Amino acid sequence: MDYDIDAIIEKLVKARNGKPSKQVQLSDAEIRYLCTTSRSIFLSQPMLLELEAPLKICGDIHGQYSDLLRLFEYGGYPPDANYLFLGDYVDRGKQSLEVICLLFAYKIKYPENFFLLRGNHEFASINRIYGFYDECKRRYSIKLWKTFTDCFNCMPVAAVIDEKIFCMHGGLSPDLNSLDQIQRIIRPTDIPDTGLLCDLVWSDPEKDLTGWGENDRGVSYTFGADVVSRFLQKHDLDLICRAHQVVEDGYEFFGKRQLVTIFSAPNYCGEFDNVGAMMSVNEDLLCSFQILKPAEKRQRVSQSSIKESKSATNSLKKSKNN
């Protein structure tokens, strides 16, 4: 049975007019529809997405629903802008269900303009522990959590924008020699303990490191700026864009601006004093950063709490020698 996707979106977005933490309780059947329909769309599109600018890129959201709505208030609700999200929609925050349902609804409504990559928290072994399973169980059922798992197992893991900006949740892999390898990953798939898929969602850049190192997370690797440079040169790319780590200013460059980390959950978990950021890429691949400050006392967004960072604009010229 098909559901009215516009009505579902309206129900979810209407929350912006109420208290920031107000729950939106869709029916079990509506959520199953969102999962099964978006799953089909994910499978109809490549594992490595080939996208075109202009678009806006967002990092981790982690169940911070009111902050997701603030990002859309600022960047424009779809279809006013094209979006690429880099994963980690669920866990830790209080409203993972609202976050993932709205993102899936937009994916269904605008399949060619709205894109969602898989993060390390879109795997059952992780979101079983860090909050999403408990939220599903408390508000709906374990069965519904399993329906989400079936959908997560089909999400794409990487994207290339205009053949120049390579995007993923985590980072590079020592096993990644050709981008075609990503295309060949068979879905549905769970996360392996090692290898290419694991690294794409788990690895981290590390300052003062040359080559590959052990990751303190106990999974995957860390990599140095030299690894980034060699990879970009080999594949004729200009920039790696990833999420996965809290950064104080919402975005942080690494290795002579050859890699950028974007994190979009301000005041993460209520414990970090970070701002969130969203990266806008225009037709000329000029990247600018929009900063989302923590909402004071969780008020609705005001113009004073969001401002564009003009000084941190990075021009990506379409050449190897960026």
From Swiss-Prot:
- CDD domains, per database record: MPP_PP1_PPKL
For this entry, the protein name equals Serine/threonine-protein phosphatase PP1-2
UniProt-annotated binding residues for Mn(2+) 1: 60, 62, 88
Name a single GO cellular component: cytoplasm
Alphabetized, the UniProt keywords read: Cell cycle, Cell division, Hydrolase, Manganese, Metal-binding, Mitosis, Protein phosphatase
Q: What's the EC number here? A: 3.1.3.16
Q: From which organism does this entry originate?
A: Schizosaccharomyces pombe (strain 972 / ATCC 24843)
GO MF term set: metal ion binding; protein serine/threonine phosphatase activity
Q: What does this protein do?
A: Essential role in cell cycle control. PP1 is perhaps required for exit from mitosis.
